């Protein structure tokens, strides 16, 4: 599109989403007339940093873009929660906030809980359920229904084939303690600071709806149970946003607490420390080493690529950095690897029928992968070295060692091994000429 790389267009769309989200939120906050409006505008760069810098390795993920557009809806909820508001939001702002906020639900429907929780705060605050049926919620519901209907009409195979497989295999693989350690402790620290910053005898509506959304955002994180940093971003962002909103409240009166007398540093410093700790999971990158990339680029030109790995990070962004092209229907082997894991779990629990069912899913996947390798003959095979449970099955049981016998090792690092097809010839490069025997007719004619 427009001759630009996809990464450029995705980044441009992300920055546009951030601009729309912050601008519309600013309009809503200003019209609502919050006492902290001036301070919030002064903290605008901090909110922008949370949407542009803080996401780190989650930048341009669906949750990131969805949260950038979700902020106006939170601001609208805060406005509706005000008991002393001079006026209520008009239909135009409600429509825009609903349109903007619906993106997060289109990303993943269970983020609807992040809409419901702030709406319940408004209902309790106003002592009326009318806010649950506000215009913005009807807009969100309508968009979701239209989207689901469109997907079902255009891609009926998604609901018929793909979604049941995702629920049966992908959805059943999860972790718990890594999420608690990686995100739970830092999130609890943020909530602790929210409690410390909460003003006495006041109800800061903006902070309240952000906190409610943050608490609600923890449920999808544990429900998905994968531990990816972008899954935690909605909950972490809303918690930090609540802290910013509390810092903007004028003349905050802190709650006295003898248990916290040891805390002598200013709360702003503690807030900065909490944000820094919460940022740690977003700091790391999956960029491959320059030596690996250079070796592949030197030997190939726009190669076709296939993975032997359950994790797509083995091939992305590597594939883009070498100007490669994935040729497999399933880019990564998550389906086969997850089915293998579930089969072993079922066998350990004594459920033989379930174990055999998942074995069959794995076998069908591997056979289709072998057929694709034979038919498409990828130039490059990216092999994940530390995924032994899966790769040992491919090599020992399904004969992928015979497939890789037609490849040679080009380069490898600590995590990946790159195979190059034996008969691959780099476009534009002629193979070296064979020396001519002195007894040959050509030599004799010379």
Regions found by a protein language model. Give the residues of each.
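Transmembrane-helix motifs of polytopic, lipid-linked glycan transferases
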Residues: 12-34, 41
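Hydrophobic, aromatic-rich transmembrane alpha-helices
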Residues: 22-29, 183-207, 211-217
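Short acidic/glycine- and proline-prone juxtamembrane loop motifs at membrane-interface regions
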Residues: 56-66, 228-229
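Specific aromatic-rich, kink-prone transmembrane helix
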Residues: 65-85, 93-101, 239-242
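Hydrophobic/aromatic-rich transmembrane helices and adjacent perimembrane loops
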Residues: 68-69, 113-114, 224-258
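Membrane-interface alpha helices of multi-pass inner-membrane proteins
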Residues: 89-109, 115-120, 214-222
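Extracytoplasmic
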Residues: 110-111, 151-157, 267-436, 440-442
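Perimembrane helix-loop-helix junctions
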Residues: 114-141, 198, 253
């Amino acid at each position: 599109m427009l001759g630009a790389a996809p990464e450029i267009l995705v980044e441009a769309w992300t920055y546009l989403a951030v601009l729309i989200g912050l601008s519309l939120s600013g309009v809503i906050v200003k019209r609502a007339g919050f006492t902290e409006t001036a301070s919030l505008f002064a903290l605008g760069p901090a909110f922008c940093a949370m949407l542009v810098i803080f996401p780190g390795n989650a930048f341009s993920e669906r949750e990131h873009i969805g949260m950038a557009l979700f902020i106006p809806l939170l601001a609208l909820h805060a406005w509706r929660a005000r008991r002393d508001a001079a006026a209520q939001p008009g239909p135009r702002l409600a429509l825009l906030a609903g349109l903007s906020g619906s993106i997060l639900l289109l990303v993943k429907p269970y983020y609807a809980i992040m809409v419901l929780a702030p709406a319940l705060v408004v209902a309790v605050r106003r002592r009326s359920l009318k806010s649950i049926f506000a215009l913005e919620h009807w807009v969100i519901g309508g968009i979701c229904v239209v989207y689901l209907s469109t997907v079902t009409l255009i891609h009926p195979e998604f609901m018929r084939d793909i979604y049941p497989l995702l629920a049966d295999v992908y959805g059943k693989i999860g972790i718990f303690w890594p999420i608690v350690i990686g995100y739970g402790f830092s999130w609890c620290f943020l909530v602790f600071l929210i409690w410390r910053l909460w003003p006495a005898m006041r109800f800061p509506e903006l902070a309240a709806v952000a906190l409610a959304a943050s608490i609600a955002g923890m449920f999808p994180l544990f429900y998905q149970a994968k531990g990816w940093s972008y899954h935690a971003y909605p909950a972490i962002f809303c918690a930090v946003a609540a802290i910013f909103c509390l810092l903007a409240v004028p003349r905050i009166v802190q709650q006295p607490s003898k248990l916290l007398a040891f805390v002598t540093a200013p709360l702003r410093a503690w807030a900065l420390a909490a944000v820094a700790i919460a940022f740690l999971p977003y700091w790391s990158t999956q960029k491959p080493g320059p030596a690996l990339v250079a070796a592949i680029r030197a030997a190939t030109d726009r190669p076709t690529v296939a993975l032997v790995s359950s994790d797509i990070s083995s091939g992305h962004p590597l594939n883009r950095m070498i100007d490669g092209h994935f040729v497999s229907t399933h880019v990564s082997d998550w389906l086969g690897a997850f089915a293998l894991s579930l089969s072993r779990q079922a066998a350990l629990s004594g459920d033989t029928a379930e174990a055999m069912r998942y074995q069959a899913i794995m076998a069908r996947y591997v056979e289709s992968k072998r057929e694709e390798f034979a038919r498409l003959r990828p130039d490059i095979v990216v092999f994940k070295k530390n995924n032994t449970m899966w790769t040992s099955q491919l090599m020992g049981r399904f004969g992928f060692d015979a497939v890789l016998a037609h490849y040679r090792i080009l380069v490898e690092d600590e995590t990946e091994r790159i195979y190059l097809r034996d008969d691959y010839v780099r476009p534009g490069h002629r193979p070296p000429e064979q020396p001519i025997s002195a007894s040959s007719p050509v030599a004799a004619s010379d």
